[in-house]
Design a protein with these regions (language model features):
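Active-site-adjacent substrate-binding region
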Residues: 106-130, 151-177, 189
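Sec-exported extracytoplasmic/periplasmic mature domains
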Residues: 21-30, 98, 113-116, 165, ...
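Hard-cation-handling environments
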Residues: 166-265
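Short hydrophobic beta-strand segments
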Residues: 1-5, 262-265
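The substrate-binding groove and active-site-proximal loops of carbohydrate-active enzymes
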Residues: 6-10, 89-102, 109, 141-153, ...
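Extracytoplasmic/secreted proteins, especially bacterial periplasmic and envelope-associated proteins
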Residues: 12-19, 23, 43, 88, ...
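Surface-exposed loop and adjacent secondary-structure segments within mature catalytic domains
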Residues: 16-20, 34-101, 109-110, 124-143, ...
Length: 265
């Protein structure tokens, strides 16, 4: 399950979600797409926060010139309050998954409980001068999560690394982003047995259509969306190749919860 755009001003995940859907449906002679359609069900939620995205897109259109300006000081890269991160009620929904205070969050958890996806990828953006983050996560590791889940995070991360190495994309793991808090878009699914992951692409609210980084390179919206698309195809590949194993271990997670040992507290 790909969930995109919970922060409405982190726009590349939305575009990559559409790219992924199109690729799976239209690709010709692609072994990854064929295996995915045969062995798995791919769910894509391309827009978790329509109100925040609407605020961001309207601000950008009102402040961009005839041609995009990559200079970070340009108005198009400096979003005004309240910005597009939050929903209509100015709530950060990537903190809300276990509180369930927002209608958008309740809609996602209802959908999750209808499908129980084995793998969940929550697509985000971060600062313009970073690269790309994927699992395994940073410490601390929540003790209520299982070793099997951590092993899967590592396996999926290694497949991402292989794809990124192939295209010479920069990335990092095990730093900055942990899986401790159950209110994240990756955290709540983890506590329900899924392999939940955050994917972070450089860009963020300042990214616009293109931004000059501190190395002098231009990071375009296409670049950002393509990096997310690449991690998505990698995730689909790994999950579809090991679909039977994922389902078996997902079943074991709930069986152990009911019949396994009781926790110390």
């Amino acid at each position: 399950w790909f969930i995109c755009g919970v922060h409405g001003n982190e726009i590349s995940g939305v575009d990559s979600g559409l790219m992924t859907a199109y690729h799976l449906l239209a690709a010709q002679n692609d072994e990854v797409a064929a295996a995915a359609l045969k062995n798995s069900i791919v769910l894509i939620d391309p827009m978790q926060n329509p109100d925040g995205r609407d605020r961001f897109i309207n601000y950008f259109r009102q402040n961009v010139g005839r041609f995009p300006d990559g200079d970070l000081q340009s108005a198009e890269h400096n979003e005004a309050w309240p910005g597009g991160r939050t929903n209509h009620y100015l709530f950060d929904m990537n903190r809300d998954w276990f509180v369930q205070s927002q209608p958008e969050t309740r809609g996602r958890t209802k959908f999750y409980l209808e499908w129980f996806p084995q793998v969940v990828a929550d697509q985000h953006e971060m600062g313009t001068n970073s690269s790309f983050y994927f699992a395994p996560p940073a410490l601390p590791w929540n003790p209520n999560l299982t070793k099997t889940q951590l092993d899967w995070l590592t396996r999926l991360g290694r497949n991402n690394a292989a794809w990124f190495d192939r295209f010479k994309f920069d990335y990092f793991t095990r730093e900055g982003y942990d899986s401790f808090y159950p209110g994240y878009g990756e955290g709540w699914p983890l506590f329900h047995g899924s392999i939940g992951m955050t994917y972070e692409q450089a860009g963020g609210p300042a990214g616009g259509l293109g931004i000059l980084t501190n190395t002098g390179d231009t990071l375009s919206l296409f670049d950002r969306a393509y990096h997310h698309f690449t991690s998505g195809i990698s995730t689909i590949e790994a999950a579809s190749q090991h679909a039977g194993e994922l389902i078996k271990e997902f079943h074991s997670y709930f069986n152990n919860a009911v019949n396994g040992n009781v926790g110390e507290y």
